[in-house]
Amino acid sequence: MVEVERVRYSDTLEREKIRAMIKARKEKQKEQTVENEKAVCPECGSRNLVHDYERAELVCGDCGLVIDADFVDEGPEWRAFDHDQRMKRSRVGAPMTYTIHDKGLSTMIDWRNRDSYGKSISSKNRAQLYRLRKWQRRIRVSNATERNLAFALSELDRMASALGLPRTVRETAAVVYRKAVDKNLIRGRSIEGVAAAALYAACRQCSVPRTLDEIEEVSRVSRKEIGRTYRFISRELALKLMPTSPIDYVPRFCSGLNLKGEVQSKSVEILRQASEKELTSGRGPTGVAAAAIYIASILCGERRTQREVADVAGVTEVTIRNRYKELAEELDIEIIL
């Protein structure tokens, strides 16, 4: 009898807890509804409010009034590539990065012999600190896979820095390389070759194109090996890579030639017309982009020589002449030299 009463009592407690949870949830939803009703533009009364997280501002989408500034971004500090990663990383902590072999989750002992107050460590404790550093390095890189990642990711970072690539490209390249390691695609290939191929694939995925020649200049492997490894990993990892467009090269080439935005816009316009007439198919994107910039610079009164354009684009003057003649003839562009 006593046991039955205990069961009934526990059931009653569970029901009360569930009712309390439902009540709290309804009250929270009601508060959110009230807040949303209050969130209107004081200038025009619009509810079309836009959160600009880059500037930390709340802006009216209709009249442009800045309603609130310097608000706190309550979003996560990490990145996720799929739903599972997003669910696993629902936490607060140090930022996570794929560009470090341990994803930035371990600690590191500084190389300077100073304490947390900036004071120099006594000679008596320096030997102990040296041993701690040595064991910390061994613990961080404890097996062959981690050693592989540590070397490859440092190589990726070096090449990306030499090419001036943004953080997103580095993260993407690190993800591609990690997938190649997980599928055991490194066996029989050099680490430098796979790292260079991963960086080339990441550049194409992020629409920040770099040519194989540019990757070769900063890597320690040949152009042929990079291309062969790239084709292999893109096939094995089923990477979805769109053909590189000549338009993607225009901003970088124009910047290298110190050309104004008018020339860049004209170059893009020429390339779009060429693409509609399928004049870019089967031709190197850098050569077509260089020819379009050469034509646009003449039309806009900021002429650059074929030699200057060729040096920035990494193509020959002959290529520019051939592509320039094709574009001018097919698009009926009159150029006064």
Swiss-Prot record:
Claim: Repeat is one of the keywords in the record: yes
GO molecular function, one term: DNA-binding transcription factor activity
Cited SUPFAM superfamilies: Cyclin-like, Zinc beta-ribbon
InterPro entries xref list: Cyclin-like_dom, Cyclin-like_sf, TFIIB, TFIIB_arc, TFIIB_CS, TFIIB_cyclin, Znf_TFIIB
A single GO BP: transcription preinitiation complex assembly
Matches recorded under Pfam families: TFIIB, Zn_Ribbon_TF
ZnF TFIIB-type: positions: 37-68
UniProt keywords, alphabetically: Metal-binding, Repeat, Transcription, Transcription regulation, Zinc, Zinc-finger
Entry GO CC: transcription preinitiation complex
Binding residues for Zn(2+): 41, 44, 60, 63
Sequence repeats: 154-237, 248-329
Superkingdom of the organism of origin: Archaea
HAMAP family per the UniProt record, alphabetical: TF2B_arch
Family: Belongs to the TFIIB family.
The protein's role, per its UniProt record: Stabilizes TBP binding to an archaeal box-A promoter. Also responsible for recruiting RNA polymerase II to the pre-initiation complex (DNA-TBP-TFIIB).
Name the record gives this protein: Transcription initiation factor IIB
